[in-house]
Amino acid sequence: MLRALVRRLVPIVVRRAVWRVRRNVPRIAQPLSFVAPRASPPERPIFVIGCPRSGTTVLLESLLRSTQLRSIHNEGHILWQPHHHPRDRGWDSDRLGAGDVGKREREYVYLAVRMFVRGRRFVDKTPENCLRIPYLLELFPDSSFVFLRRRPAENVSSLMEGWRARPRFVTYRLPERLDGLGPLSGPNWSFVLIPGWRQLRSAPLEEICARQYIACNEEVLEVRDGIDPSRWHDVAYEELTAAPLETIRSLFERLGLAFGPAVEEHARSLTSRPSFTTLSPPRADKWRELNGPEVEKVLPLLAPVGRRLGY
């Protein structure tokens, strides 16, 4: 509630300035990594992954109510983005593989995490990590993953809301224009930069969002079966919102975390209080009200991955 109030009262220019400061704090570890003793990988980190607008922020906020967990006060991509910004790789995409981990990068990331989590388990939520699971496994060999899935129509509609909420959620200023977005046309890209984005430069918004949903979820499904089931935890957005207390308690048990009073209180509040990133109150068939005709056009495109996800 307090965070939502601050968001309403504080001008976005001020919030963005504060965000830039917070974004750069973990980078203090970069020069220190050259002189500090070598840090070991954090033990059993937890990565919350899922397509943008699938509810990953809600899940992260719930996990951070645990006294056993700590994040770096921002999405984890700020740790490795200096090493792997898309502009340094021909603006290809946000995808990274195991071979992309560098020696100096490894020492810097380990030190930065150790500085900020201070003995607790590291937890992170970064939607781009849907495209980076092999990279994360190379950096953090004993990591666990919490994969949040959401029904295709609802998720794509929420992505469309996010794209329209400029300047929020803009991730990159591309070297080439997007020309099929009407008033949103231009070089700005929101959320995950997916492989093959250049083929979408003339595509309408609903197709870009559908392709983001497909790319994020298909990448996860391709690698999921190769990970020890004890380190992989599926959560459905629909279950999280319909029965948050039971869903979060079950997840905490699977992750070996204590389900304390603060966690329980937060879980109970989710039925009435959406996340601070929620753009409009949740309700049944909201996607039909907001973006029905557009989303219906891409439902055939979404159907195969939706079936693989159990929808």
Tell where the protein language model's regions lie, with residue ranges.
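Acidic-histidine catalytic/liganding microenvironments
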Residues: 66-67, 140, 227-229
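Conserved phosphate-donor/acceptor-positioning beta-strand/loop module used by diverse small-molecule
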Residues: 125, 136-162
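PAPS-dependent sulfotransferases, especially Golgi type II membrane carbohydrate sulfotransferases
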Residues: 1-45, 168-311
